[in-house]
UniProtKB/Swiss-Prot annotation:
Organism superkingdom: Bacteria
Pathway given in the UniProt record: Antibiotic biosynthesis
UniProt xrefs under Gene3D superfamilies: Aspartate Aminotransferase, domain 1, Type I PLP-dependent aspartate aminotransferase-like (Major domain)
Pfam families the UniProt entry points to: DegT_DnrJ_EryC1
Protein's recorded name: dTDP-3-amino-3,4,6-trideoxy-alpha-D-glucose transaminase
EC number: 2.6.1.106
Keywords associated with the record: Antibiotic biosynthesis, Pyridoxal phosphate, Transferase
Source organism: Micromonospora megalomicea subsp. nigra
Modification sites for N6-(pyridoxal phosphate)lysine: 186
Cofactor: pyridoxal 5'-phosphate
Length: 374
């Protein structure tokens, strides 16, 4: 049987009764769109973060898009972000007519290099979008100081960082607005698509509610454009309510899996060139994915697949600026050297809180055999 980096089935077996009860509760309520479950989830997710507002939306991509629009980013504005991210981060910027401006990432933790951001700011820059990648947070203290000094908006992409902290503060609480994805693989994942934006600003929250509902503030009357059909549905909201009560347990489970990898693979770092994740000072990592690094990555992945039936992911094999869909940005190859080097060396080991010990041990043993045999 093939081993994959993620599976929801073991988690579902444990939570089946609660998940099915959530679905039945919604179906029996008589309300499928923007009903009590969405309202309750928004209240509870905001409370978890100690923040004033949460607005549920239909997916993480639109969460980033609506977050940007809600703080006033629009056509021809520039937004500083990274290319070492999932493409939807950049798609969200591009779709509203703004221009992504890329800075490189740090070699040690693969996060936005905040020392490079100010040099990327121009008179057209309106916002910065740091991506809390793989489960740990960018240095938001540095970005907040810069944003305030230069009059810029700060929008966190928290799709991979539910429950993560930096200097004691939760991801999503360190900006003007913060976008979350509840795609099924996430640390807090739905059984389908979902997203949310959190903010402490009343007017931003009002704009978000209008933006997700066609630009309407009352039924059938468009108050202001743009407007979208971007609502979190009741079924996913009710499932997320149930799973939110277990978020800290999910995080603890992921950290335990990460520690087991450290115990089983750490000695290969000095002897055989395998690099394990570095947890930056001040970060409380939630290990959305467990990204390792080796200069012979492609050979390792092939041997694991062909010889051990272990199928691994690469997050991400193509920097966004090198994709043909973003050729119009005109970003030259070689302009982001760390990002481009990482794309040829990083890969992900299986990571989910219900990962069985015997399966993880099989992966560890296989990785050891392959790498020591290179």
């Amino acid at each position: 049987m093939t081993t994959y980096v993620w599976s929801y089935l073991l988690e579902y077996e444990r939570e089946r009764a609660d998940i099915l009860d959530a679905v039945q509760k919604v179906f029996a309520s008589g309300s499928l769109i923007l009903g009590q479950s969405v309202e309750n989830f928004e209240t509870e997710y905001a409370r978890y973060h100690g923040i004033a507002h949460c607005v549920g939306v239909d997916n993480g991509t639109n969460a980033v898009k609506l977050a940007l629009e809600s703080v006033g980013v629009g056509r021809d504005d520039e937004v500083v972000t990274v290319s070492n991210t999932a493409a939807p981060t950049v798609l969200a910027i591009d779709e509203i007519g703004a221009r992504p401006v890329f800075v490189d990432v740090r070699d040690e933790d693969y996060l936005m290099d905040t020392d490079l951001v100010e040099a990327a700011v121009t008179p057209r820059t309106k916002a910065i979008v740091p991506v809390h990648l793989y489960g740990q947070c960018v240095d938001m203290t540095a970005l907040r100081e810069l944003a305030d000094r230069r009059g810029l908006k700060l929008v966190e992409d928290c799709a991979q960082a539910h429950g993560a902290r930096r200097d004691g503060r939760l991801a999503g609480t360190m900006s003007d607005a913060a976008a979350f994805s509840f795609y099924p693989t996430k640390v807090l994942g739905a059984y389908g698509d979902g997203g949310a934006v959190v903010t402490n600003d009343d007017e931003t929250a009002r704009a978000l509610r209008r933006l997700r509902y066609y630009g309407m503030e009352e039924v059938y009357y468009v108050t202001r454009t743009p407007g979208h059909n971007s609502r979190l549905d009741e079924v996913q909201a009710e499932i997320l309510r149930r799973k939110l009560t277990r978020l800290d347990a999910y995080v603890a489970g992921r950290r335990a899996v990460a520690q087991r990898y450290v115990d089983g693979l750490a000695d290969l770092q000095d002897s055989h060139g395998l690099e394990l994740p570095v947890v930056t000072d001040g970060n409380e990592h939630v290990f959305y994915v467990y990204v390792v690094r080796h200069p012979r990555r492609d050979e390792i992945i092939k041997r694991l697949r062909d010889g051990y039936d272990i199928s691994l992911n690469i997050s991400y094999p193509w920097p966004v600026h090198t994709m043909t869909g973003f050729a119009h940005l005109g970003v030259a190859s070689g302009s982001l050297p760390v990002t481009e080097r990482l794309a040829g060396e990083i890969f992900s080991l299986p990571m989910y809180p219900s990962l069985p010990h015997d399966l993880q041990d099989r992966v560890i043993e296989a990785v050891r055999e392959v790498i020591t045999g290179l």
